[in-house]
Amino acid sequence: MRFIKVFLFVLTGIILPVCLSAQTVSGKLIDENSQPLPYANVVLLSLPDSVFVSGTISSEDGTFTLEATSVNQIVKISSIGYKTVCKAVSPVNLGIVQLVSDAQMLGEVVVEGNLPVTRMKGDAMVTSVENSVLSKVGSANDVLTKIPGITKKQDAFEVFGKGTPLIYINGRKLHDLSELEQLNSDDIKSVEVIRNPGSRYDATVKAVVRIQTVKRQGDGFGFNLRSSYYQSDNTDLIEQANFNYRHNNLDIFGSVYYNQMESWQDFTLQLEERGTKVWNHDMKSYGEFYSKMLSGNIGFNYQLNDNHAFGMKYKSGKTLNERNPLSKETNINVDNVFYDNIKVHSCDNYYYDPDHELNAYYNGQLGEVNVDFNADYLQNGKSSNSLFQEISQTSENRDVHSVNNVKNRLVAGKLTLSIPLGGGTFAIGSEVTYTHRNDDYINEENYVPASYSKIEELNATGYAEYNRSFPWGDWSLGLRYEHVKFDYYEDGRHIDEQSRTFDNFFPNISFSTQLGKVQAQLSYTAKTQRPTYSELSNNVFYSDRFTLQKGNPTLRPTIIHDLTLSGAWRFLQMSLSYSQTKDWILNWGELVNEDASLTMLSQRNWDKSIPMFTAFLSASPKIGCWAPMMSVGMQKQWLTIDYFKESKNLDNPIFTASFNNTWELPLGFMLGLDSYIQSAGATQNIYSEKPNGYVNVSVRKSFLNDALSVELRGNDILKTNRMSYSMYSGDYYLYQKSVWDRQEFAVTVRYKFNTAKSKYKGTGAGDSQKSRM
């Protein structure tokens, strides 16, 4: 609390003097189609000698603010492809400023595939995609794999040293990563990576990826089609169709998406539990996964005038068929003496309710106040029926039937107000989210007791942020307050000891500057990581006759303090981070019986603060038709745990390296060769035993002036994308080695006609709670 008081005192000391002495020049930039114009250069010059006083860049919504120290000054506004505009600083509110195209300048712009430029802008590393080689690599999925600092692991992306990011497209938060496959790379304008998000974002968010799309011109109807065929040991299919109709200020859009996926996993597992006896399990397992999913969305955006826009988007989807058959055989020894051999055949069948997701937004300018409001509703549910058939060599056989029903509902609203203040921008906002979850588990044979649980959570947030540019750098200060009320019910009864209330403050501060051609930023943030709703469930799940699984309703949120230094120079980007993590949530195995014959897998908070250091360096030069992107990274933690009554140090660093290459060739051909490798090392109480990685190759050919494209791709051609790791936890040890059918050949055909990207500006609310579902 003392730190919070000092922080507020410093914040007041910075804001108050500038409010008393400065006049704020503000305005909003638009293009010829009345669309906001971001990234334009806005500089304040003194008269009559035109000496530079201060400068800034217009934000995503086209707004800008500057501090004028005299009426004898002018504002100069410039952007590539537009005529430069100069305005007097009187009146200080310049209102709407429209920039018109400069035909001569546009004629000189090279629009062939050039090197994607990564620069630092505010709190983000921004990579330009439009008119670069990245615009031709396929989908947004393919683009993100080539962005410095982003790595794709299995079916998710990670920002190095920060974990899984929130991903936004035009300010709208992604809840389904399949949308990245639906977004064509040539529709992307830029990708921004924020490694230390400020108070505007939920305190659980440790990294953000913002994708901005190209704003298409003109009215009319457009569509784009995509069909993909993937052949590994199984066959996967993706079919999609997007449409857009635009007339004057009305924009109507929608899409239909179908995904059919089959896969397998072959893994070996070794378990050891030590109680009064020592149990060893050697398991070989083979599992398959089948899924078919159909989804669609429709929405509209209406631009009332230059200052007001509103819209709505509805999305629905349903998994048509999903099942997971599994076969495994386990040899069990007790004190090095044979105990049993058990063969298991199981199958999980999943039945999904249709998902419903609705977002409505309003974005407007009321005088000098920018208003951004979002409201969200989300509903989903699923039921799983599981059958385990256990055949024992020395004990009784078992048939185990279980049913798990889960239903989620969420309502959220978010409001942000931004105003010019003291030569900078002051933003204040609030977000309220209500979540309701039912989770029932029933075991017909009563090997584990039936449970009927309910979770209700109210998250109320207030935040404030101040940004100001000086000739020597940019400051940003913010503070976020979060009130979380968590109520847990079991069998219809409120469980007081597992229901809690949290009140936390999360400050952030950052400073950005430019020294010659070097851009640098130093930032501090306080973050949290809340347990998922399944981790909070007290339901007990049957894994086998020796192992049960459940959540832990007593879990506390993790608190993270992070200090990050980022820099950029020409084609080089660098990041250094140091963090302290308190109450880290670890997967943990505990003995139920003293003789270790039964183990419960759950989660726990680590009661000591864990320090971590990460370093990252990337380079993206251009050599003729060759555009390489090379990166190296290191992550090291300092963690010691109790393991089999002894201390186990898990401080081995993890090293990563990637080398992505793109060659642009004549006749519309483009070649790609991407590789990634990760060393052995420790993360939390898990140690990766062996290096793993992949090599992907691709060739793309465009036709009909790029309206039609065909891509051939080979993924994991060396079949090295596999995993082997150990988990250490008290009296329980697990080793797993997994192989997937990720080596595959793919063909993708895309066709587009008069495409126009949606102008939808909804950003969503309750994002972190949606992710926890």
What is the role of each PLM region?
Residues 67, 146, 172-198:
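Short acidic/polar hinge/loop motifs at secondary-structure boundaries
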Residues 347, 454-457, 497-500, 528-582, ...:
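Outer-membrane beta-barrel signature, preferentially recognizing the C-terminal barrel domain
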Residues 48-63:
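Short, acidic Ser/Thr/Gly-rich low-complexity loop/linker segments typical of extracellular
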